[in-house]
């Protein structure tokens, strides 16, 4: 049963950002509290980003809702997320996409996220411990790719794993600020479809730890 607190959180999000009905339903279906570290449980239903281990953060639920909606979610099947973190974004995506693939480079976060997702019975979410810059070639091509960390550029490996005509949404570092951009793949190259808004994400880092 979905909690009143989670419902009220979604109401607050909707006041700030008009939610697609599918995104709102997905956000209401996933209890954020499950993904929040114990010391911050009392902040679970605020719109704040919250600290996790390994100098990482669970994104604001407002940000999660926006990033999900920016993917243009109608008539799509698969999505690859770069940066699983707590697993919250992947869980929300699982309510919309038939298949969700998420890569995490920090082993402790990967193990915790995998356990949470399994406990929730989200069998359509697949999580891998690996360098996100390399994507997950085994199940490519993907209809959508979502970066949950800020990139300086999009690696060719990920462009190759995106379906022709597919959409990639990523925070991009530009000079001294980050901006969320939506790209579309055309003729095997990415074209900026829209610059969406300024943002603040942890950076994409090479390798694993």
Swiss-Prot record:
CDD domains: AdoMet_MTases. One of its GO terms (molecular function) is protein-L-isoaspartate (D-aspartate) O-methyltransferase activity. GO terms for cellular component: cytoplasm. Its main location: cytoplasm. Catalyzes the methyl esterification of L-isoaspartyl residues in peptides and proteins that result from spontaneous decomposition of normal L-aspartyl and L-asparaginyl residues. It plays a role in the repair and/or degradation of damaged proteins. It comes from the Bacteria. The keyword Methyltransferase applies. This is Protein-L-isoaspartate O-methyltransferase. NCBIfam families: pimt, PRK00312.1. It is found in: Cytoplasm. The gene is pcm. Belongs to the methyltransferase superfamily. L-isoaspartyl/D-aspartyl protein methyltransferase family. The keyword Ion transport does not apply. The active site is at residue 59. It catalyses: [protein]-L-isoaspartate + S-adenosyl-L-methionine = [protein]-L-isoaspartate alpha-methyl ester + S-adenosyl-L-homocysteine. It comes from Helicobacter pylori (strain P12).
């Amino acid at each position: 049963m979905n909690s009143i607190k989670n419902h009220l959180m979604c109401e607050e999000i909707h006041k700030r950002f008009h939610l697609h009905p599918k995104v709102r339903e997905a956000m209401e279906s996933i209890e954020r509290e499950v993904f929040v570290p114990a010391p911050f449980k009392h902040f679970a239903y605020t719109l704040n980003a919250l600290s996790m281990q390994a100098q990482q953060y669970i994104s604001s639920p407002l940000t999660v809702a926006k990033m999900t909606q920016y993917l243009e979610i109608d008539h799509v099947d698969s999505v690859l997320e770069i940066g699983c973190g707590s697993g919250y974004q992947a869980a929300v995506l699982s309510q919309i996409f038939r298949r969700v693939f998420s890569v995490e480079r920090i082993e402790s976060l990967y193990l915790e996220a995998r356990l949470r997702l399994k406990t929730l019975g989200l069998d359509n979410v697949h999580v891998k411990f690996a360098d996100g810059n390399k994507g997950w070639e085994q199940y490519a091509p993907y209809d959508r790719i979502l970066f949950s960390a800020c990139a300086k550029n999009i690696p060719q490996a990920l462009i190759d794993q995106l379906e022709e005509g597919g959409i990639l949404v990523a925070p991009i570092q530009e000079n001294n600020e980050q901006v969320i951009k939506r790209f579309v793949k055309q003729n095997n190259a990415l074209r900026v479809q829209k610059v969406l808004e300024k943002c603040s994400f942890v950076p994409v880092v090479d390798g694993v730890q």
